[in-house]
Each structure stands twice: as structure tokens, then as C-alpha cells.
């Protein structure tokens, strides 16, 4: 019958929705439809497989969307990770080693007090974790970042500009949750890439 994801998406657009949620952009056809819809003043939410927020921008460029279109249609780029939460039933404090702290980029001299981990219990099936929470990395599209996108800048340049504009990395967001006793250092290492 010739029904494809792209043709279905075009059919949805004929209904003139105010907001469009696209499960995932995997190819240039879907990306092209999403970009054109966003450029006509509609709000589009979608997902793209990438390691972090700057990588999402370069992924859209790699799919084949023109830099001026990518720069014009994005308002916010966000990366997220779901991390395991320490079980509240068996949560216990411990003093981290200087090596542990240094491994994730924390200054051992600045960390005061205990960090936490779960020792394992029946509530968490002896894992030390129960439930999940999200950590986020967001890039509001500032003028300077748009300019880099228009120029087809590489991922590192986009990342640096985003950091200069206050972006909190996934690792930094995770470490904030370590320091407030919600997740473990191991979860930060497992779920985030090492900062350069």
C-alpha cells in the first residue's frame, strides 16, 4: 500500500497540528519533514541518537540537513540519561577515596562529608539501587552557537561554546546528584562519557 513512516508523517502534517512529537529521527526524510514543519512556526519535539547535546547537532548535520536549516529551527537541544537511584532502605554513607573522586573530576579537597551507596537489601533485591532518575544536559541555542552551526563547526567547537554559555554537562549533572546523596559515583561513570 506504500505506507512508510515519511508518508504517514506527511499525512499527519496535513491535519495542521500545533505541536508535533516524532518518536525518532533516523533518516534524512524524517529530518527534512521535521525541520520544514519547525520552520513554519510549529513546535516539534523529537529524539536523535547521540552521546550528548552537542553531538545531537552534528548528527543532524551528518544526516544531511543544511546547516542554515539546523541553526534556524532549533531552540533547545537536550541530552538525558536515566541513572539508578540509591535504595533509600539500605543507603549508607562512606568516605570516598581520593582516587575515586579524581576519577570523576571532583577535587578531593573540596568534597566534605560522606557520599552514599546502597549496601543491598530485600527492597532493592540486593542491588543497592531502587528506581531511576534523569540527568540532563541542555543547550539553549544562543546566537553564537547558531553561528557555529551555520558555519558547520565541529562538535568540540559547539561543545566549547555551549560550555561558555553555561551548559551543565551530563557528568556535572550526575556529580551534583552524587553530592546530594541520590546516586553513586559508579552510576556517573557508567552513564556519562569522560569530560575532555
Please give the residue ranges for each predicted region:
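Short, flexible helix-loop junctions that flank or precede catalytic/ligand sites
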Residues: 1-196
Amino acid at each position: 500500500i506504500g505506507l512508510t513512516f515519511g508518508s504517514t508523517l506527511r499525512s499527519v502534517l496535513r491535519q495542521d497540528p500545533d505541536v508535533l512529537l516524532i518518536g525518532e529521527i533516523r533518516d534524512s526524510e524524517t529530518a527534512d519533514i521535521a525541520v520544514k514543519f519547525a520552520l513554519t512556526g510549529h513546535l516539534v519535539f523529537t529524539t536523535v541518537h547521540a552521546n550528548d547535546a552537542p553531538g545531537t547537532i552534528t548528527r543532524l548535520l551528518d544526516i544531511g540537513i543544511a546547516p542554515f536549516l539546523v541553526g534556524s529551527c532549533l531552540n533547545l537541544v537536550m541530552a538525558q540519561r536515566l541513572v539508578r537511584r540509591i535504595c533509600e532502605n539500605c543507603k549508607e554513607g562512606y568516605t570516598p577515596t581520593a582516587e575515586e573522586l579524581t576519577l570523576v573530576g571532583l577535587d578531593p579537597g573540596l568534597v566534605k562529608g560522606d557520599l552514599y551507596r546502597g549496601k543491598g537489601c530485600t527492597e532493592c533485591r540486593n542491588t543497592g539501587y531502587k528506581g531511576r532518575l534523569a540527568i540532563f544536559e541542555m543547550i539553549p541555542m544562543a546566537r553564537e552557537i547558531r553561528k557555529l552551526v551555520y558555519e558547520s563547526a565541529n562538535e568540540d567547537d559547539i561543545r566549547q561554546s555551549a560550555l561558555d554559555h553555561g551548559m551543565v554537562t551530563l557528568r556535572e549533572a550526575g556529580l551534583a546528584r552524587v553530592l546530594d546523596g541520590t546516586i553513586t559515583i559508579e552510576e556517573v561513570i557508567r552513564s556519562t562519557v569522560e569530560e575532555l
